[in-house]
Amino acid sequence: MGNKFTNISTNLRNSWLTAKSGLNNAGQSLAKAGQSLKTGAKKIILYIPKDYQYDTDKGNGLQDLVKAAEELGIEVQKEESNDIAKAQTSLGTIHNVLGLTERGIVLSAPQLDKLLQKTKVGQAIGSTENITKGFSNAKTVLSGIQSILGSVLAGMDLDEALQNNSNELTLAKAGLELTNSLIENIANSVKTLDAFGDQINQLGSKLQNVKGLSSLGEKLKGLSGFDKTSLGLDIVSGLLSGATAALVLADKNASTSRKVGAGFELANQVVGNITKAVSSYILAQRVAAGLSSTGPVAALIASTVSLAISPLSFAGIADKFNHAKSLESYAERFKKLGYDGDNLLAEYQRGTGTIDASVTAINTALAAIAGGVSAAAAGSVVASPIALLVSGITGVISTILQYSKQAMFEHVANKIHNKIVEWEKNNPGKNYFENGYDARYLANLQDNMKFLLNLNKELQAERVIAITQQQWDNNIGDLAGISRLGEKVLSGKAYVDAFEEGKHLKADKLVQLDSANGIIDVSNSGKAKTQHILFRTPLLTPGTEKRERVQTGKYEYITKLNINRVDSWKITDGEASSTFDLTNVVQRIGIELDNAGNVTKTKETKIIAKLGEGDDNVFVGSGTTEIDGGEGYDRVHYSRGNYGALTIDATKETEQGSYTVNRFVETGKALHEVTSTHTALVGSREEKIEYRHSNNRQHAGYYTKDTLTSIEEIIGTSHNDIFKGSQFNDAFNGGDGVDTIDGNGGNDRLFGGKGDDIIDGGDGDDFIDGGKGNDLLHGGRGDDIFVHRQGDGNDSITEAGGHDRLSFSDSNLKDLTFEKVNHHLVITNTKQEKVTIQNWFREEEFAKTVKNYVATRDEKIEEIIGQNGERITSKQVDELIAKGKDNKIDKNDLANVVNSYELLKNSRNVTNSLDKLISSVSSFTSSNDSRNVLATPTSMLDTSLSSLQFARAA
């Protein structure tokens, strides 16, 4: 039993795979049904091999067939065997009564002769030589076959089908197979040649005027002389009615009322009547054959039938309807915004879902019949006619249904196509799919308007310019593929909005965003003195797209994407003080990917920014950037994103504010633009559309170089950066990480940020703030200022001359502890953090221990200042250390210094000077430092467009 179920399952699967492999996208194959083949669609040839011998003296039946054929207008052709064999082999139509060749439909005289000699017929008529009523019977048989073919192949342009090997050719072959099966089964069911000819003729006459086999089941039931017990035409009628209904539904010229009737026939007669008839019919056949019909046998048959019904098929259909329902709900909002594409997609899902449901129901019934008959016929010799009937008919009907299903799918898809074309015709110059992106963008704008209106306050800018990239949309991609309009679709679209004083402005007159040519111009700032340019979502690289749809297989198409790339974005600013965050501008393009989707070869898009006037801030992204700060005080930030450690070398620069920045981005993930493929299915037609989008991709590391001109400050990364300053005034912030900063010449402002940094001011009057971490600070020559705050850690300071100052900006001097440790002065705050001034006492001690030693180095800090401007000089420190016990300054002595009138009298100028210096570097911080004044909106995390992307059903 297990083997039998396995065989049944295998046969069903093979039948399904065979049917599936034959699907294609032709939508015209079932049109113009109802014309008879006799009227000229393609001629019929009665084929007689040249070497086929028959005895005319004995009245061979073939002679009568020839005469009948000539009278009926059927061409009689004698051909060389090898020529016909070649044609038959090439078209796959061999060993049948009927076949297709390049010259027409061949009626094989030898095969017909063999058919007439089969046991039942032969017993009644003896042999071919004794065909009774010769000519009249021959004419009856040929006329019947001719009529059957006229209906089965109605409307098919066989000339074109034979030339192009199109879908119609496959359908024609299936129709011939159906006719062959009918002829075979009639021959197996009758006992005389008269009956055979009569049945063929009756069937042909019944079908003669039936358009597309419409109501064939009812026609067959009216045939006289058919034995339902032997042929089971109650089931055959239902099956053929199902096929006929499918043909009607696929016929684009059929009326709505006809299609409604056909749908009713599918749902009721096929699914209902056939399913009910299966079990009783099978059991009746077993009784007629003298086989068992007991409970266990009935259970066996029922279980076999149930095995043939796949719940997964119906689950898939349910998914289509659920998807359609979700799409309709989703579409309501976008329809109000001027886009009805989601409704079209829902219409397609419902239409094809209905077709799927109908065809699946029929195929389920077919599979159940095949399985049940196999079980019923087990061990029976007399059941072979029934098995022949089922195997010959159900497989052919299933094939026809599958081809009809594809045609019906294409019919639904064509309606979608036509609606899109009609919309574009009524809206000249507009693109339907671009209109879809517009609607998606407007919906996103509505959803985020409250957040956007608050950006002026949150970003502290009079004007906020928000640039939004609407990326690839799966629903739009599905619609483009289904409608065969993939060449018109875009990978996305960029939009720009402006906000001032909490109001939304039209940005088209304020900002030029040209994605095709790579231009972003925000120079028209109007009355706004400050503006923030915010890229809300990753902006794709500039350029134009062109697509071409090509066929890659019998049912496979791909719409190839060609990009005319522009190698850079050109950003222009004007008089306003502007902030640009470029970390969301895609600069890396994944040209080649490995099987895991990791980037193995890349291309880069440069950013060229001319900032104009104003005090500007630029947050650099992942690729090469050229920035000309122009006038004003301009800062370049590397503190956002994870784009590798900096190496800045300005030692050879000849102009102030000019820097070359080299970066190496280590192996990891970075934002890349890549090309992917979207797949949409229309039955067996597969549409692939290439599109570009951005996401974080694994890469093997890369180098990039930035060129900065007229830049006043540079803020580093979270990595271990190296800064080498110029001979001019430099301003560096190390950010996080263990940074090495060398100011070189000039009056530099150097800030270490987090991490154990090494900072050397070099020549010039430098401002040095180690930030958090245990830092090594060297002032070099010049009048240097050092800053330490509570929480900054343990710093070590080395000085080499000049009038230097150390500010404890948030501590009172009287709360500090001053202590001599070896040659060094150690100052400890209330958090027990220490600032060690290296070699403070070394020169004096050398003078005491080395004869005739002359001090040559000044390694002291001349003034140490508290948060309120109180100060103590290096001379006072030396005196109080010498006076105190254990090499420490006495607290009372220190308090007296703090409270000194003269210090208070002169402190104001000192305090004001230091406050300006300290506040000027307050923005020298990484993005996560509490002292950063250029924050990222926290609510940016809620502005992703991904929430708008509709999730397609599996």
Swiss-Prot record:
GO terms for molecular function: calcium ion binding; channel activity; toxin activity. It is found in: Secreted; Host cell membrane. Acylated by LktC. The toxin only becomes active when modified. GO terms for cellular component: extracellular region; host cell plasma membrane; membrane. The keyword Transmembrane applies. Its main location: secreted. Keywords: Calcium, Cytolysis, Hemolysis, Host cell membrane, Host membrane, Lipoprotein, Membrane, Repeat, Secreted, Toxin, Transmembrane, Transmembrane helix, Virulence. It is a multi-pass membrane protein. GO terms for biological process: killing of cells of another organism. The chain crosses the membrane at residues 230-250, 297-317, 359-379, 381-401. Pfam families: HemolysinCabind, RTX, RTX_C. Hemolysin-type calcium-binding repeats lie at residues 715-732, 733-750, 751-768, 769-786, 789-806. The transmembrane domains are believed to be involved in pore formation in target cells. Belongs to the RTX prokaryotic toxin (TC 1.C.11) family. Pasteurella leukotoxins are exotoxins that attack host leukocytes and especially polymorphonuclear cells, by causing cell rupture. The leukotoxin binds to the host LFA-1 integrin and induces a signaling cascade leading to many biological effects, including tyrosine phosphorylation of the CD18 tail, elevation of the intracellular Ca(2+) and lysis of the host cell. This leukotoxin is a major contributor to the pathogenesis of lung injury in bovine pneumonic pasteurellosis. It also has weak hemolytic activity. The lktCABD operon has a complex mosaic structure that has been derived by extensive inter- and intraspecies horizontal DNA transfer and intragenic recombination events. This is Leukotoxin. The lineage of its organism: Bacteria, Pseudomonadati, Pseudomonadota, Gammaproteobacteria, Pasteurellales. The gene is lktA.
